[in-house]
Curated annotation (Swiss-Prot):
Residues 605-619 have a biased composition (Polar residues). It comes from Homo sapiens. Residues 1-138 form the VIT domain. Residues 354-527 form the VWFA domain. Gene3D superfamilies: von Willebrand factor, type A domain. SUPFAM superfamilies: vWA-like. Residues 569-650, 670-726, 751-794, 957-976, 987-1055, 1118-1159 are annotated as: Disordered. This is von Willebrand factor A domain-containing protein 5B2. It comes from the Eukaryota. InterPro entries: VIT, VWA_domain-containing, VWF_A, vWFA_dom_sf. Pfam families: VIT_2, VWA_3. Residues 588-604, 681-700, 1125-1138 have a biased composition (Low complexity).
Length: 1242
């Protein structure tokens, strides 16, 4: 219940007027609000303003004015001494109001300090008023259909009791009701009364409330990179108009069509016309490029550097040190992208996930539910299971594919589950989980089942750990007892998961299956973003991590542009140095400044510890000589006109590199080529300027694959051949006045540039695979990975020269490829006017194992002119109220990047501690400059005129200083035993020993009994791809109800499906054997008699071989006679007729035809699987929400098979459903030959 409070009694002061102006620019919302409060008490009171902060929200301006005195705020460093007087209170957990220490300071816990802005406003006179002005910027959430959801903070629209009743409205919808078209009823219709809204007062959470109605004025300007297809509001009637000074049709003005009744919050839904296309938004800085250059050159430290060393690269390095401080001064590009994942059907057979189950002692009572969840997983997923008490004991050293052996071992381990003694340590379990190595194309999902209620301090540390690793996994938490709701809800909210709480008498199975359905929904993982910028620009990219995207998630990336051509000297002859500097979101400190390397030297760098989850940054390099006056181009552009063979494009791109021919020819064209160039150097931070050097021979170690580590790459990363830079329309000029050689230079300006990519360091699993050059297309198969290290050997990267093996004799040279350098003294041909600068962005990712690609571009002529030396057009006057929203969000993202680097990793070495301190300093400086919130800064009330701290103002402190999480890295954390405890596989699991949950051998060494487990270097084993199975995730199927005659039978129970589920194989099939017959309670003879395969009926007596399917007509179920004669008859033991093969290789057995043992086993397994599906529909229909995924996996396996004997899937399922009708007749002792219906029509 945020708002303005009197801290002595924490009573809210009433709001009398709310004035709100907003601007929605794509997915970014800027808000300027003016709130007027009244003091109803007869004496003056102190004021404390409480404002709830959304995730990634920045409050850039605050001012409280009362009686001519204005109070503002500024961010200062959070010192440990500030919390000294607060430590005696101990950490608070969920207190409804701020506590007070012995010195009278207001004390907030860490979670409250992160999610709430609490500022003293000064004294309010008796019966006086106070006006609070607020400026904020935030990111708008999106829905799966791409709709943006705008919800104003409730402090701007608090709930108030209804005013005097008006004339009654007629029931239902009417034409004169402005809210009827939006489906919004009146207050009486919704039954919303002020008494129902009453709740315990909590100043940190819940909707804001006001004791009396107030006036409300609202106006929102909606603009963006695309047109708006529509807008609606579930709460209010809206009016949309064109603003009087709108520059395009993409800008509209939204106001309220009727008065605000103070009974609900304001919500608006924006429908973009291109909801699932990437968009780029450009926002100019507060200074032009010339003003920024003059500002930097006027600095004394820059002048000292210039006197010592006039090298241009050193000057660029100086700028890089200031990039995070000068974000507000330079232009910013924002990338927004909401992929269309909701339209993709739930293909259970192609969903790739890594699932980690974390169980504490309370999970022992829910073994059946855990077994059901494990059995419901698709075979291509990775799985691991760990139990935790005081210690964490995983079953496997790393996650393994869901093979038959692995699933059987996990299920047997769950049956004999013994949880380590001691209270459950959720922090240790999550620390182990996030420290596991990531697997490419396998987004991680955590399933935490616990009843733990940790202390408040442990809860805060656990939430902080998940905050810094929230991009690595989604957490689905299940509270099995009197657990801490704040902990589980916080974990799920931070990781975009979901929290479930089990009430007494409730079953866990539906909750687990529902969470599994959400975990297996379509996802876009392993996302990389390549930014192509002009040569004269350095860029700062943020965020440094790109998590996997699920339906409703959107990718927001920011790129701050810095023009450095005025600082970097141009080499003579149009030749560029081999290396240029690039900027990332993390920058080197002065002591790490790289010196200008001499030609022939190799830049060096250091890489980050692997446990921090970061990937080394790479250097970028120019692709073109920028001196247009001294370089010549050819007429034919190999990108647009590669010659007779379009596949030769990459060859010519390779030849065009300056390293190919250095002395006698000059490059004619340069493009962002996918082919290799000089090797890249790695650095734990974005490198400074490296001098001219020869990078040949540089082959840094390749860091592990990480999901979403953002950095820079040399040139265009490998695998980007589907996205060449487009050639813009050439500027008009006189053709007759120019030579033929000059005509080919029209594409040079757009093609010259540099690629900045994120994230780097991923292995190219299938090198040399060509990709389709189509926008937004699905690429055909695995492709070279973005950000690949380009300096690796030929054996590591495949054919580095060409995209595919080709005959060099077929390589045809396009005309005018090379032109000779004009002799000295000769005038060079006249220059062509350069093209306008552009920025091009390429987004790549994996949906399952299918590569995806999107691209988008934007012109930069509004910033730096059209490129011909003329001044850029003057931008339209922009109202200062919006306060550079994109810049503020960029700065907030940079702050989070540096906070993660400072807090995530350990500090075992001096280098680690120095690196953490530098990141802490950058986060601190960026936060102070841009007003972005940080855990290293705290807001302090100051006088708005003098900017001095108010001496008598109420101080707000945090009970805990910001420090790294109290757990060391996962590799050194709570796994006390030297070897990981595992199990003995010889003949099942041994009974659990008192030492832990899993058994180990006498020496304590791990025993790998699962076939050939995946090793960390080889990655997970993947089963062969299967045809996708369409699974409807969003609606319930209408299934057959149990037979009324069997209602009192044990077969009619709704929850007796677990014996059958236990028999399901990992691919989804069942075996036709004695255990299966016992699970479905149908004799083996009846199953064989009702089988549509003749081989099963032939195994019975000759009299019954043709019954009952002789009535189906010829061709159905009639196999080859040779097949029936060579098929072995079933034994009377435990093995059924289908238990001939080992059960593996079902996908290949279908191709063997109906002959041999494989065909016999396939017949038995397909018939048993169809019977199992029909049995679940007839016997356990009421428990559909529990066995839904199990049945979907079985159905997916059935659809992937090629049935023998000419039988199709529909006939097989019809035979299985008809079996239960036959069972009814058999139970009633009827003669089958007297039946007057055909089972094929059932």
């Amino acid at each position: 219940m945020p708002g303005l409070y009197c801290p002595s009694s924490w009573t809210p002061l009433p709001l009398t007027d709310s004035w709100v102006r907003a601007c929605a620019n794509g997915p970014c919302l800027s808000v300027r609000a003016r709130l007027t409060y009244r003091n109803p008490q007869p004496q003056p009171v102190d004021g404390v303003f409480v404002y709830p902060l959304a995730e990634a929200e920045v409050v850039s301006g605050f001012e409280a004015e009362a009686a001519g005195r204005r109070v503002s705020f500024q961010l200062q460093s959070r010192r440990r001494s500030q919390a000294a007087c607060c430590r005696a209170l101990g950490p608070g957990l969920g207190t409804p109001t701020p506590r007070r220490c012995a010195q009278g300071h207001l004390v907030l816990d860490l979670a409250q300090a992160r999610s709430t802005l609490v500022l003293p406003t000064g004294i309010i006179a008796a019966a006086g008023t106070m006006t609070v002005t607020l400026h904020s910027s935030r990111e708008l959430p999106s829905r799966p259909d791409g709709v943006l959801h705008v919800a104003l903070p409730t402090v701007l629209t608090p709930l108030a009791p209804p005013g005097p009743p008006g004339p009654p409205r007629p029931p239902g919808l009417c034409d004169d009701s402005p809210t009827s078209c939006f489906g919004v009823g009146s207050l009486q219709e919704e039954g919303l009364a002020w008494e129902e809204l009453a709740a315990p007062r909590d100043v940190f959470s819940g909707p804001a409330r006001c004791p009396a109605p107030y006036t409300f004025s609202f106006e929102m300007l909606v603009t963006g990179p695309c047109l708006l297809a529509g807008l609606e509001s579930p709460s209010h009637a809206l009016r949309a108009d064109a603003p009087p000074h709108a520059s395009s049709a993409a800008t509209i003005c939204v106001t309220l069509a009727e008065g605000h009744h103070c009974d609900r919050a304001l919500e608006i839904l924006l429908h973009p016309s291109e909801p699932h296309q990437p968009h780029l938004m450009l926002e100019g800085g507060s200074l032009s490029s010339a003003e920024y250059e003059a500002r930097v050159r006027a600095r004394r430290d820059f002048q000292r550097l210039q006197r010592r060393d006039s090298d241009g690269d050193r000057q660029v390095w100086f700028l890089q040190r200031r990039f995070h401080k000068d974000i507000l001064l330079n232009p910013v590009l924002a990338l927004s992208f909401c992929p269309d994942l909701s339209s993709k059907p739930g293909h259970l057979g192609t969903a790739t996930r890594e699932l980690l189950f974390l169980l504490d002692s309370s999970s022992v009572a829910h073994k059946d539910a855990i077994v059901l969840a494990v059995k419901s997983l698709p075979p291509q997923t990775l799985i691991n299971l760990a139990v935790f008490g005081t210690l964490v004991q995983p079953l496997f050293p790393e996650s393994r594919p869901c093979s038959d052996d692995a699933v059987q071992l996990i299920c047997e381990s769950i049956e004999t589950l013994q949880v380590p003694s001691g209270p459950p340590d959720v922090l240790a379990a999550l620390d182990w989980a996030v420290g596991q190595p990531q697997h490419r194309a396998y987004p991680r999902q955590l399933f935490l089942l616990t009843a733990a209620s940790p202390m408040a301090a442990t809860t805060h540390r656990t939430l902080e750990l998940m905050r810094w690793h929230r991009g690595t996994a989604r957490c689905f938490s299940f509270g099995l007892g009197p657990t801490c709701h704040q902990l589980l809800q916080g974990l799920s909210a931070l990781s975009r998961g979901q929290a479930y709480f089990l009430r007494p008498g409730q079953r866990l199975q539906p909750m687990l299956v529902q969470a599994l359905r959400k975990a297996l929904e379509p996802a876009l993982s392993d996302i990389s973003v390549d930014w192509f910028v002009p040569d004269t620009v350095e860029a700062l990219l943020t965020p440094r991590e790109i998590p996997a995207l699920y339906p409703g998630d959107q990718l927001l990336g920011y790129c701050s542009l810095f023009r450095v051509d005025g600082f970097r000297s141009r080499p003579p002859g149009g030749q560029e140095p081999g290396w240029q500097s690039s900027g990332g979101s993390v920058f080197p400190s002065p002591e790490e400044a790289p010196s200008a390397a001499s030609p022939g030297t190799e830049p060096t760098g250091t890489s980050e510890p692997l446990g921090t989850g970061t990937v080394s940054a790479e250097l970028s390099s120019p692709w073109a000589a920028r001196d247009s006056e001294q370089s010549t181009d050819a007429l034919t552009d190999p990108v647009t006109d590669p010659g007779p063979n379009p596949s030769d494009t990459a060859i010519w791109r390779r030849i065009f590199q300056s390293s190919y021919i250095r002395e006698q020819y000059v490059l004619t064209h340069c493009s962002a080529s996918p082919e290799p160039g000089p090797g890249s150097t790695g650095s734990s931070e974005s490198p400074g300027s490296q001098g001219p050097g020869s990078p040949e021979g540089s082959a840094p170690l390749e860091p592990p694959s990480q999901q979403g580590c953002r950095s820079l790459a040399w040139g265009e990363p490998a695998g980007s051949r589907s996205c060449p830079l487009p050639a813009p329309t050439p500027a008009p000029f006189k053709v007759g006045a120019l030579s033929t050689e000059v005509l080919g230079r029209q594409h040079r300006a757009a093609l010259a540039g540099r690629s900045l990519s994120s994230p780097p360091g991923r292995a190219n699993q299938v090198p040399g695979r060509p990709r389709k050059p189509s926008l937004g297309a699905i690429l055909d198969g695995p492709s070279p990975e973005p950000g690949q290290q380009l300096g690796q050997g030929l054996d590591d990267s495949g054919n580095l020269l060409s995209p595919a093996p080709m005959d060099w004799d077929m390589l045809m040279e396009p005309p005018f490829l090379f032109t000779a350098v004009p002799p000295s003294g000769e005038l060079a041909p006249p220059a062509v006017p350069p093209q306008a600068p552009r920025c091009h962005v390429v987004i790549r990712g994996l949906c399952g194992e299918q590569p995806m690609c999107w691209e988008v571009g934007v012109g930069l002529e509004t910033l730096w002119g059209p490129g011909d030396g003329s001044q850029p057009p003057s931008p339209p006057v922009r109202e200062a109220a919006w306060d550079q929203a994109l810049h503020r969000l960029t700065a907030a993202s940079v702050v989070r990047d540096n906070e993660q680097l400072a807090l995530r990793g350990g500090a075992e070495t001096t280098a680690d501690r120095g690196h953490a301190r530098r990141c802490w300093l950058r986060a601190l400086q960026t936060s102070k400059v841009s007003s972005a919130p940080s855990c290293f800064t705290c807001p302090v009330a100051v006088d708005a005129t003098t900017r001095e701290v108010l001496p008598g103002a109420l101080q707000v402190c945090s009970s805990e200083p910001a420090e790294p999480p109290g757990t060391p890295p996962a590799s050194h954390s709570h796994l006390d035993a030297a070897p990981l405890p595992t199990v003995v596989y010889s003949k099942g699991l041994q009974r659990g020993s008192p030492a832990g949950a899993w058994d180990s051998d006498q020496n304590g060494n791990s025993k790998r009994a699962l076939g050939d487990p995946a090793t960390p270097t080889e990655g997970p084993r993947r089963p062969p791809p299967r045809p996708p199975c369409r699974l409807s995730m969003g609606r319930r199927h209408k299934l057959c109800s149990p037979d009324p005659g069997q209602a009192n039978n044990s077969e009619g129970s709704d929850h007796d499906y677990l014996p059958l589920v236990r028999l399901q194989e990992a691919p989804g099939s069942f075996r036709l054997d004695a255990p299966f017959c016992a699970a479905v309670r149908i004799s083996q003879e009846r199953l064989c008699r009702a089988s549509p395969f003749a081989v099963h009926r032939a195994s019975l007596s000759p009299t019954s071989a043709s019954l009952p399917w002789a009535l189906l007509g010829p061709g159905v179920g009639q196999g080859d006679s040779a097949t029936a004669s060579c098929s072995p008859s079933p034994s009377s033991g435990s093995e059924g007729p289908g238990q001939v093969d080992s059960g593996r290789g079902s996908d290949t057995e279908a191709s063997e035809g109906a002959e041999g043992l494989g065909g016999t086993d396939l017949r038995g397994r397909t018939w048993a699987t169809a019977v199992a599906l029909a049995w679940l529909e007839h016997r356990c229909a009421a428990a559909f929400d529990e066995w839904e995924l199990t049945a979907a996996k079985a159905d997916c396996w059935l659809r992937a098979q090629h049935l023998p004997d000419g039988l199709d899937l529909a006939a097989l399922k019809a035979a299985a459903r008809g079996l239960f009708l036959l069972l009814r007749h058999w139970d009633q002792n009827l003669q089958l030959h007297l039946l007057c219906y055909s089972p094929a029509n059932v």
